[in-house]
Each structure stands twice: as structure tokens, then as C-alpha cells.
């Protein structure tokens, strides 16, 4: 049989609609309700974890600290111990527990971001920087928020 070189089009169809740029431009780029709920849940969980640390005598040093190598959710300090906490929030266990989401790759990113965080404060005389620089130990915690329940896993990696 004969195979045409051009796609078969109706007389009213335009070639313009075949371009990939047009198809990409037509996608919906707005934030979905589920994405907005996820962001709100994450912020609520970070607020909950920050309050937990404060109630236990820690000073919150930083929240959502960003660098090229990652993000630190909550950084706190107490008794010369710098605590870096990765916060994982889930509405349910349907896709695994919050702790299971902290993979070895994520742990490495957090460790590298922590090194960048400490380096960024080395030369500073800011009171927070002095507190961070006086820390002799770094501890990595994971805060698991499932629904409204908080479980703290201290010194987990």
C-alpha cells in the first residue's frame, strides 16, 4: 500500500497545531489543590517540629535554609550540640512511612548542606553564628509527622 509522506489532515486543520511548542504551551501550569495541600502540610509540620524543639530547650537557628546542595528544614542548638532535623510529613502511610522517605541519597544531601551551612557562618560574629560555631557535635534527627502525630527520631543518621 501507499504511505503518504505527510500526515493526513482535514481541510480545516492547521499545521500550527502539530508543533511541540504549541502542545507544551497548552498545558495547565497552575498549582493544583493537592500540591497546595502538600505545601501547607509541610509548613504545618515544620511549625510543629520547631515548637517541639523550643519546648525541649533548643534554640531554633534556621528554618528552610537553602544552598546549592540542598535544604535544611529545621536547625536547632542546645548544649553545644547542633541538631539538623529533616521533617517528613504524610497524610497517611499509603505510600510508605515518613521515615522511609529519608533515603541514603537524601541523608547525603542533608550532610552536605549542613557542611555548607556551617561554612557560611564561620567568619560571622552574629549571635546565632557564634552559637552554631560553638557546637562541638552535629546530630541528625528525622521528624515524622503522620496526620497530626509527631514522632521524633533523634540521632538517626
Question: Whereabouts are the PLM-identified features?
Answer:
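Short hydrophobic/aromatic patches at helix-to-coil boundaries
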Residues: 153-157
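Short acidic/glycine-enriched loop/turn segments that link adjacent beta-strands
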Residues: 67-70, 147-148
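Acidic-basic catalytic patches of nuclease active cores, encompassing PD-(D/E)XK
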Residues: 1-63
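Catalytic cores of nucleic-acid endonucleases
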Residues: 2, 16, 28, 89-148
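Conserved catalytic cores of phosphodiester-cleaving nucleases, focusing on short active-site segments
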Residues: 53, 72-98, 110
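Protein kinase-like catalytic core scaffold
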Residues: 81-83, 139-141, 151
